[in-house]
């Protein structure tokens, strides 16, 4: 793939995964399918993670409490992404928690209203990520600790490619099915890119042990969640893609904080 093509795919991936505006000229010849675009998801994660990382750096530089700074940074990240992945996590939690069968779970996941399981999942997601990010900030210099945000953003979006490629669509008429399924090459490129980005950001800043811990935690989380969804729904949906990102981000941040 040419560098220009990859840059265009990254910009399109940013537009799909966030509310960051991109030039309309990038979409004139684009068919809207995401099968190839997933290879750029990790690089899109870097772009998406830049704004919350900058906010965290500013707050830590002003000697703000690390937990408060982490919560504000995560809130800004939600604004940047339009809560795309958080919505998927909440819908998946409601569907899996409230559905007694595959069909009932999928029906619940279509409901835009949030239920008890979804609310609990969102609260826990924010709480655990904020606590982990605050722990990283307490044990690292401000300029070092903020690198965790784009690193984990890239890693968790690479995990989306794995989940998406390894499972068939749960619904033939679903959004995920209409967007196309990544091929093996796109998935492998996304995983390799995510690993490279994480290595370049985490190893120099935090060391080898935190790097290995975050990679292992995210990988195990992606494998376990994909196997769980295969058993429960026999396929992926747009919501389970978002849930994969959230779960892997939580796992990577917790592992990174623990390994420091």
Curated annotation (Swiss-Prot):
A Pfam family hit: CobS
A GO-annotated cellular component: plasma membrane
Name by which UniProt lists this protein: Adenosylcobinamide-GDP ribazoletransferase
EC top class, as a word: transferase
Catalytic activity: alpha-ribazole + adenosylcob(III)inamide-GDP = adenosylcob(III)alamin + GMP + H(+); alpha-ribazole 5'-phosphate + adenosylcob(III)inamide-GDP = adenosylcob(III)alamin 5'-phosphate + GMP + H(+)
Chain ranges passing through the membrane: 40-60, 64-84, 117-137, 141-161, 188-208, 209-229
Keywords: Cell inner membrane, Cell membrane, Cobalamin biosynthesis, Magnesium, Membrane, Transferase, Transmembrane, Transmembrane helix
Known role: Joins adenosylcobinamide-GDP and alpha-ribazole to generate adenosylcobalamin (Ado-cobalamin). Also synthesizes adenosylcobalamin 5'-phosphate from adenosylcobinamide-GDP and alpha-ribazole 5'-phosphate.
Source organism (scientific name): Rhizobium leguminosarum bv. trifolii (strain WSM2304)
Pathway participation: Cofactor biosynthesis; adenosylcobalamin biosynthesis; adenosylcobalamin from cob(II)yrinate a,c-diamide: step 7/7
InterPro entries assigned: CobS
